[in-house]
Structure formats: structure tokens, C-alpha cells
A protein has these predicted regions:
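Conserved hydrophobic residue in the first alpha-helix
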Residues: 42, 74, 106-107
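Ankyrin repeat boundary/linker residues
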Residues: 35, 67-68, 100
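Conserved ankyrin/ankyrin-like repeat signature
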Residues: 52-53, 84-85, 117-121
Length: 126
């Protein structure tokens, strides 16, 4: 009986550890980000590079300079190399020189991610 209880407790503990680890992604030894499955739909469309949805959401009133976690949609578009989304956001008034909580601009985030297209577009639009 004791073995059965201990086995069940170990399985529950291991399951909860695996569940918790899904919410944290280690990008490298010095960087990490929390993965939020309840991410704002506008930011999700930006990250995916869904230009049509981003345009529609802006038309419906989404703020191109909204911040989540200190970052703007433009910063996410730059980090994920979404050149067309960058053009759209800047065309609709996104602030190119805005800084996140760590002092990074969209250009710096593109550089850190080696997002070459994003860097080119941001240079053109600055």
C-alpha cells in the first residue's frame, strides 16, 4: 500500500513539473521568456506574420503601440522577422524608436534574433 501511494505521488509530482515547464522557454543561458497561452490576439497575429488579420485588427481599433510585457507589436514583428507586418505597423503609426523595459528597440531585437529582413525594413523606415 505504501509503495502504491508513493508511486502515485511521484507520478503526480513529475506530471506537475512537466506541466509547469511548458510555460517557460529557455532561449539561451542569459535569456528566457514566459510563454503565455492567453496571448493577446493582436500580438499573436503579429508574431505569426498574419498580415491580413493584423490589418483588420488595426482597422477595428487595435493600438499599434500597445505594450505587453514592455514590448510593442513592432518589437515582436522585428524579433520574428515579419517584414510585411513591420511595414504595416509603421505605416499605421508604430513608433520605431520605442524601447522595451530593458532598453531594446525593435532594431536591437531584430539584430539579436538575426532577423535580416526586419533589420533592412526598419533601416528603410527610420
Amino acid at each position: 500500500m505504501k509503495k502504491s501511494i508513493m508511486t502515485v505521488l511521484m507520478i503526480l509530482f513529475i506530471s506537475s513539473v512537466n506541466f509547469a515547464s511548458e510555460d517557460l522557454q529557455v532561449l539561451d543561458i542569459y535569456d528566457y521568456e514566459l510563454v503565455d497561452n492567453n496571448i493577446d490576439p493582436f500580438f499573436k497575429a503579429v508574431i505569426k506574420g498574419d498580415l491580413e488579420t493584423v490589418a483588420k485588427m488595426i482597422e477595428d481599433g487595435s493600438d499599434v503601440n500597445l505594450r505587453i510585457g514592455g514590448k510593442t507589436p513592432l518589437m515582436y514583428a522585428a524579433r520574428y522577422n515579419r517584414a510585411d507586418v513591420i511595414r504595416l505597423l509603421v505605416g499605421k503609426g508604430a513608433v520605431v524608436g520605442a524601447k522595451d523595459n530593458q532598453g531594446n528597440t525593435a532594431m536591437k531585437l531584430a539584430e539579436l534574433a538575426n532577423a535580416k529582413e526586419a533589420m533592412e525594413v526598419l533601416k528603410e523606415m527610420s
